[in-house]
Design a protein with these regions (language model features):
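Conserved helicase motor "Helicase C" RecA-like lobe of SF1/SF2 P-loop NTPases
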Residues: 192-208
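Structured core elements
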Residues: 4, 89-93, 102-105, 184-186, ...
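Non-catalytic, compositionally simple segments
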Residues: 1-89, 100, 116-159, 166-169
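Metal-dependent DNA phosphodiester-chemistry modules and their immediately adjacent helices/loops
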Residues: 1-21, 203-289
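Short glycine-rich phosphate-binding loop at a beta-alpha junction
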Residues: 179-190
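Phosphate-handling catalytic cores of nucleic-acid transaction enzymes
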Residues: 289-296
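Acidic, metal-ligating active-site segments
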Residues: 97-111, 274-281
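Feature representing long, continuous alpha-helical segments
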Residues: 54, 101, 165-172, 194, ...
């Protein structure tokens, strides 16, 4: 049976005198200078720490941490007035019929490196009705769903489920009312029925719908690129409070190779549906960027 060298406690990871426990070949097989560099990098970038603990100290990790800080994601810039956009690349999250659903449209202007995001959210009307019947002043999930509905940022669907057809209707609204045509729409193939997919294809064309497989192979690099664009304030989402809530709720899970994917926190009330919809759209945008930009 192979013997695994590891630290006695994860707290020893930044104590050079303890490193020999997990690295008996330190100084020969692995240079101390290399380990010092990796530890310092982890101190400067906490998201890198789980990688160091696993690869250099053999400490098992479930590497999960916040994807964006509030400083990263906060952007109060508003969208330009109507008529600024002609095409968009869409994405939507429809994973749960009895909960929050979201759709996004990435728009862009010629000569402008910012991405402008249009969005819509849906929730079952029963969620709000139950709250009113209970006289509960604290809204479910601790956020003001009723206010967001009254502000037009979110829509309700009658009953206890979201009829996912409303997502198609919203993209049709963009086309018919705002003259913004969806060039492509990204979707998770696990969470769309054949019937709804056929309806999208009938409305916009078979080639418009693009599968976005979930997991690190598809999402890792786009997540890293999108994070950088948020940090550079190149993602303009009209200061939408639901977007901010979903973004701040999003955590990233990192494997030992540094690949990342989005995950929900352990708290059920912390929704990330808006982030999931944006990522689906952004993955397609990255793959279709040249074609998209040639049309704007």
């Amino acid at each position: 049976m192979p013997f695994i060298y590891e630290l006695d406690d994860a707290s020893e990871w930044d104590k050079p005198e303890m490193w020999i426990k997990a690295n008996p070949g330190l100084g020969t097989i692995k240079k101390k200078e290399y380990l010092e560099e990796m530890v310092q990098k982890a101190k400067n970038d906490p998201s890198f720490k789980p990688t160091v603990l696993v690869k250099d100290f053999n400490i098992p990790q479930t590497a999960q941490s916040a994807w964006l800080t509030f400083e990263d994601l906060n952007n109060e810039e508003l969208l330009p007035e109507g008529g600024a956009f002609r095409y968009c690349i869409g994405g939507f999250d429809a994973a749960d019929s009895i909960d929050l659903n979201a759709a996004k449209a990435i728009c862009k202007r010629r000569g402008d490196d910012k991405l402008y995001i249009k969005q819509m959210y849906w929730i079952p009307q029963a969620v709000l009705d139950q709250q009113e019947e209970r006289g509960d002043r604290r809204e479910r999930d601790g956020v003001p769903y009723s206010l967001w509905v009254s502000q037009g940022l979110m829509r309700t669907c009658e009953g206890r489920r979201v009829n996912k057809r409303v997502i198609l209707d919203w993209f049709c609204e963009l086309r018919d009312r705002e003259d913004i045509y969806p060039l492509y729409i990204g979707y998770d193939p696990w969470h769309i029925s054949d019937e709804l997919l056929a309806a999208f294809e009938q409305e916009f064309g078979r080639n418009v719908m693009v599968k976005v497989r979930q997991g690190v192979l598809t999402l890792s690099q786009p997540m890293k690129d999108l994070k950088a664009e948020f940090q550079e304030k190149k993602i303009v989402y009209n200061n939408n409070p639901i977007d901010k809530w979903c973004l701040i709720n999003t955590e990233e899970k990192k494997d030992v190779n540094g690949n990342v994917q989005p995950v929900k926190s352990d708290e059920r009330t912390r929704r990330i549906d808006g982030t999931a919809a944006l990522l689906d759209a952004y993955v397609v945008y990255c793959n279709k960027r040249d074609e998209f930009e040639s049309l704007i």
